[in-house]
């Protein structure tokens, strides 16, 4: 089986959908290669989406959107477009993962290429 050029359909992806504290999150790329993060309240809330300010650099099936939540501060962490390239990472403001605050891109910081002082993949 080949995944050449396909994104959003990867059998190995483990954190493209995430459930945490009464909310469900999903991440994917649009046909124009922008990263999207969506959320809904459980059990049956409607999905709300936001577009992050990052476009996929290459249509490679290994470039998945990975989501995580920090239980310490309620931040949502998003890593994307990281196959054989530098890291592209963004996190939300504290508490967004556990609150009903508005779901808008301005609740996330700028896309960066490091974690702390460590540049990854440059």
Regions from the PLM with identified roles:
Residues 1-122:
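Extracellular, repeat-based ectodomains that mediate carbohydrate processing or recognition
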């Amino acid at each position: 089986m080949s995944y050449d050029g396909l994104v959003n359909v990867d059998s190995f992806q483990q954190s493209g959908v995430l459930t945490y504290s009464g909310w469900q999150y999903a991440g994917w790329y649009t046909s124009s290669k922008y990263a999207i993060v969506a959320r809904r309240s459980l059990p049956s809330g409607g999905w709300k989406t936001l577009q992050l300010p990052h476009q996929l650099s290459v249509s490679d099936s290994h470039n998945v959107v990975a989501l995580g939540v920090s239980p310490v501060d309620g931040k949502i962490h998003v890593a994307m477009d990281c196959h054989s390239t530098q890291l592209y990472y963004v996190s939300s403001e504290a508490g967004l993962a556990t609150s009903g605050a508005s779901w808008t891109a301005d609740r996330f910081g700028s896309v960066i290429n490091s974690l702390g002082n460590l540049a990854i993949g440059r």
